[in-house]
Regions:
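Hydrophobic packing and interface segments
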Residues: 2-750
Length: 750
C-alpha cells in the first residue's frame, strides 16, 4: 500500500509554502528568545549566602517532586501510547489518502508522546526558571523596584515563549507531514499534552495547598507568627508548592489549552478545506499563532516601570495591551490580504475581546480595590462563618457573569458566520479560542510573575532583608496574586472554547445528526457527565485535607518537641514536610486521571455515541461553572485576607484576621487545586471521547458508521473500566493508603 506524506506542499500556493516555513521559523525564534532570556536572568546576582541557601532548598524540593512524579506516571504513559496506537489503527480506515493503518496508529502514538514530552518540558523548565528567578528578584529589590519587576516578568516570559514555540512547532510539523490525515494524528498530540497537564495540575495542586494550609493554620492561626517565618517547618514546602503548582502546573495547563485549541481549529479547518478546496482554513490559525509569538516578544520590552515605585500592574497591562493591539492588527492583515474574508478577522478578534473581558471580570471579583473583596473583608469582623458565606456569594455571582461572557462569544461566532452550515460556526468558536490564546506569552508571564514574587518575598522574610526590599517585594507579591487569578480565568475560558470545538469535531467526524436529550440514554449520560467534575473535585480536595492533617501534626510536633525551633536558634526539619507533601501528591495522583480517561470509554461502549455526546455536554457545562466558582471564590478570600494584613480591621493577629485566614484556608484548595485541575479534566475527557470513538464504531460501505452495540467484548470493556474507577476511588478514600503510614512514623518519632 503506497504511503502519502507531505502532500500539503504539493497543493499549497507559493505564498502558503513560505507561510508554513515562516511559522516554523517563528516557532523556533520563540524558543531561541526563551534561551536568550534564560542566559540574561542567570547572569543576575543571587544575593547573600543565606538567600542562596534558601533558594537551593526550594530548588531541591521542586526538582525532587517533579522527578518522582515523572517516574510515577511513566508506566501509564507507556500503556496509553499503546492504547493510542490502536485507536489510530481503528481510525486508519478513514485515511484521506488510504495510508496504511499502522502508519496512522504510529503517527497518533508519536504525536501523543511528542505532546506529553513538550508539556513536561514546559512545566519542568518553567518551574526551574521560576526557582532560579525568585532569589534574583529578591536581590534586585534591595536596590531597584524597576529591576525586580523586570526580572520577575521576564522569568515568566521564558515559559511563555516555550509554550508558544513548542505548541506551534508541534502542530505545524504534524500538519506539514500528514496534511489531510493530520486530524487523526493531532488528536494524539493534544491528548499527550493534556494528560501531562492533568497530572501536573492535580499533583502540583495537592502539594502546594497541603503545604499552604498546614503552614497557615499552625503558623498564623495557632502561633500568630508571620507568613514565611523560618521557624515554621512547612515554610520551605509552601514555597516549593508555589512553583510546582502555579508554575509547572499552570504552564502545562496553558500549554495544553494552546495545543488543543490549535488541534480543534485545524481539525475543523481541514474539514472545510476538503469541502472548499482552500487551505486558508488551516493556514490562518497557524499565522495567527505565529503573530502572537512576535507580539509577545515585542511587548516584553514595554513591561517596565516608567518611574521608581509605579504600580506593577500598570506596567504589565501596558505590555498586554501592546500585544493585543499587534495581534488584532495581524488578524486584520491576514484576513484581508490572505484569506480575503474578514470573518476570520472578526472571529479571532472576539477571542481577544473575550480574554480582556475575562481579565476585567476576574479583576473585579478578586482585586483588593473592588467591592466584592471589600465586602468579604468587612464580613470577617463577625467571624469565620460570615466570611465563608460572603465568599460563597461572590463565587456564585462571578460564575454567572463568566458563563454569560463565554456564551456571548459563541453567539458572536454564530452571527459572524450566519447563513452558513454549523461547521463554520464551530470553526469560528475554534478561532475565538485561537484569538484568546494568541497572547499566551503574556498570559504565562503574568501567571509565573505571581509565584516568582511570592517566593522572592518568602526568601526576603526568611533571610531578614531590609524593610525597603520587603516593601518592594510585598507590593510585587500583591500584584502577583491578581495576575495569577486573571490567568486562571483565561485558562478556564479557553478550556470551554476548546472543548466546544472538540465537541463539534466529534459531532462532524461521526455524523451525529442530532443529540436528543429526550432519549433516556442521552439524558442519563448528561446527568452522569455533570456529576464527574464534582467527584473529581471531591477527590482532589480530600487529598489536600488528608495531607494537610499530617503536615499540621508534624509542624505542631516540631514546635513542641524540638528544642530551639520556637526560639529561632535551631532550624526546623523542613525536609520532613517536603517529604510528606511529595508522598501525598504522588499517592493521590492516579485516581483522578483514571476517572477522566475511563469514564467516557465506559459511557461510549455502554450507551453509544449520541449518549457519549450528552455525557460530554454535562462535563463541559458543570466543569466550567464549578471551575469559575472555585477560582474566584478562593481568590476573593485570599485577597480579603491580604487587605486585613495591610492594616484593615485590626491588621495581623486580630480576630478579623483569624477569620480571614480561615476563609483563605478554605479557598486555597478550591482556587489552586480542584478549580484549575478541572480545565485539563474537561479536555482529557473530550479528547479521549474523540480518540476512543473510532473503537466504538464499525465502518460500513459508503463511508458511514454503525455502532458496535453491546457484545461480550464491549460489555467486558465497560465492566473493566467501571471496576477500575470504583476500585481506585475506594482505595483513595482509605486513609491507610497514605495517612497511617505517615502517622506511624510520626508516633515512632515521639
Amino acid at each position: 500500500m503506497p504511503i502519502t506524506l507531505f502532500e500539503g506542499f504539493r497543493v499549497a500556493t507559493a505564498f502558503e509554502k513560505y507561510a508554513l516555513i515562516g511559522v516554523v521559523v517563528i516557532a523556533i525564534l520563540g524558543l531561541l528568545y526563551a534561551a536568550f532570556l534564560t542566559r540574561q536572568i542567570l547572569r543576575e546576582p543571587e544575593g547573600t549566602d543565606k538567600m542562596r541557601h534558601i533558594a537551593s532548598a526550594i530548588r531541591s524540593g521542586g526538582n525532587a517532586y517533579l522527578s518522582r512524579q515523572f517516574r510515577t506516571i511513566l508506566l501509564l504513559i507507556f500503556l496509553l501510547a499503546i492504547f493510542v496506537f490502536f485507536t489510530g489503527w481503528f481510525a486508519g480506515g478513514t485515511s484521506a489518502y488510504g495510508n496504511p493503518k499502522w502508519l496512522i496508529g504510529l503517527g497518533r502514538a508519536g504525536g501523543f508522546l511528542m505532546g506529553a514530552i513538550f508539556s513536561a518540558l514546559v512545566g519542568y523548565i518553567g518551574m526551574n526558571m521560576a526557582m532560579q528567578g525568585n532569589v534574583r528578584v529578591a536581590q534586585a529589590a534591595r536596590s531597584s523596584f524597576t529591576k525586580a519587576l523586570q526580572i520577575a516578568y521576564r522569568t515568566g516570559t521564558i515559559t511563555g515563549m516555550l509554550t508558544d514555540g513548542l505548541g506551534l512547532l508541534g502542530g505545524t510539523i504534524i500538519f506539514i507531514i500528514f496534511f489531510r490525515d493530520a486530524p487523526l494524528v493531532l488528536l494524539g498530540f493534544g491528548f499527550g499534552g493534556t494528560l501531562i497537564a492533568l497530572f501536573m495540575r492535580v499533583g502540583g495542586g495537592i502539594y502546594t495547598k497541603a503545604a499552604d494550609v498546614g503552614a497557615d493554620l499552625v503558623g498564623k492561626v495557632e502561633k500568630g507568627i508571620p507568613e514565611d517565618d523560618p521557624r515554621n517547618a512547612a515554610v520551605i514546602a509552601d514555597l516549593v508548592g508555589d512553583n510546582v503548582g502555579d508554575c509547572a502546573g499552570m504552564a502545562a495547563d496553558i500549554f495544553e489549552s494552546y495545543e488543543v485549541t490549535i488541534v480543534a481549529a485545524m481539525i475543523l479547518g481541514l474539514i472545510l478545506t476538503v469541502s472548499t478546496g482552500q487551505l486558508s482554513w488551516i493556514i490562518f490559525p497557524l499565522l495567527v499563532r505565529a503573530a502572537g509569538v512576535f507580539a509577545s516578544i515585542v511587548s516584553t520590552y514595554s513591561v517596565r516601570a516608567l518611574r521608581e515605585g509605579e504600580n506593577a500592574m500598570k506596567a504589565i497591562h501596558r505590555g498586554y495591551w501592546l500585544a493585543a493591539f499587534l495581534s488584532v492588527l495581524s488578524f486584520l492583515l491576514f484576513g484581508w490580504l490572505y484569506a480575503h474574508d474578514l470573518r476570520f478577522f472578526w472571529a479571532t478578534s472576539v477571542g481577544v475581546a473575550l480574554a480582556i473581558a475575562i481579565n476585567y471580570l476576574t479583576d473585579y471579583y478578586t482585586s483588593t480595590e473592588r467591592t466584592p473583596v471589600k465586602e468579604i473583608a468587612k464580613s470577617t469582623k463577625t467571624g469565620p462563618a460570615t466570611t465563608i458565606l460572603s465568599g460563597l456569594g461572590v463565587g456564585y455571582e462571578s460564575t454567572v457573569m463568566a458563563i454569560i461572557v463565554i456564551a456571548l462569544s459563541i453567539i458572536a461566532s454564530a452571527l459572524i458566520w450566519r447563513g452558513t452550515d454549523i461547521i463554520y460556526i464551530f470553526y469560528g468558536v475554534a478561532l475565538c479560542g485561537i484569538g484568546q490564546l494568541t497572547l499566551t506569552g503574556n498570559n504565562i508571564s503574568m501567571d509565573a510573575f505571581g509565584p516568582v514574587c511570592d517566593n522572592a518575598n518568602g526568601i526576603a522574610e526568611m533571610s531578614g532583608l531590609e524593610p525597603k526590599a520587603r516593601k518592594t517585594l510585598a507590593d510585587l507579591d500583591a500584584v502577583g496574586n491578581t495576575t495569577k487569578a486573571i490567568t486562571k480565568g483565561i485558562a478556564i475560558a479557553s478550556a470551554v472554547l476548546a472543548a466546544v470545538a472538540l465537541f463539534a469535531a466529534f459531532y462532524e467526524d461521526y455524523q451525529l445528526e442530532t443529540i436528543n436529550l429526550i432519549q433516556w440514554k442521552v439524558f442519563v449520560s448528561f446527568l452522569i457527565g455533570g456529576s464527574i467534575p464534582f467527584l473529581f473535585s471531591s477527590l482532589t480536595i480530600r487529598a489536600v485535607g488528608r495531607a494537610a492533617y499530617f503536615i499540621i501534626n508534624e509542624v505542631r510536633w516540631q514546635f513542641a518537641n524540638v528544642k530551639g525551633v520556637w526560639e529561632g536558634t535551631v532550624d526546623p526539619d523542613y525536609g520532613k514536610v517536603v517529604s510528606i507533601c511529595t508522598g501525598a501528591a504522588q499517592k493521590e495522583l492516579l485516581t483522578p486521571a483514571l476517572l477522566a480517561i475511563l469514564s467516557p470509554i465506559a459511557i461510549g461502549f455502554l450507551f453509544g455515541l449520541e449518549a457519549l455526546a450528552g455525557f460530554l455536554a454535562g462535563v463541559i457545562l458543570v466543569g466550567q461553572l464549578l471551575a469559575v466558582f472555585m477560582a474566584n471564590a478562593g481568590g476573593a478570600w485570599d485577597n480579603a485576607k491580604k487587605t486585613i494584613e495591610d492594616g484593615l480591621y485590626g491588621g495581623k493577629g486580630s480576630e478579623a484576621h483569624k477569620a480571614a485566614v480561615v476563609g483563605d484556608t478554605v479557598g486555597d484548595p478550591l482556587k489552586d487545586t480542584a478549580g484549575p485541575a478541572l480545565n485539563p479534566l474537561i479536555k482529557v475527557i473530550n479528547l479521549v471521547s474523540v480518540i476512543a470513538a473510532s473503537m466504538m464504531v464499525v465502518q460500513v460501505a459508503g463511508g458511514g458508521f454503525r455502532e458496535r452495540g453491546l457484545t461480550p467484548v464491549t460489555i467486558g470493556v465497560v465492566v473493566v473500566c467501571l471496576a477500575i474507577i470504583v476500585g481506585s476511588v475506594w482505595v483513595s478514600k482509605k486513609e491507610e493508603s497514605f495517612g497511617r503510614e505517615i502517622e506511624e512514623k510520626s508516633e515512632a518519632k515521639k
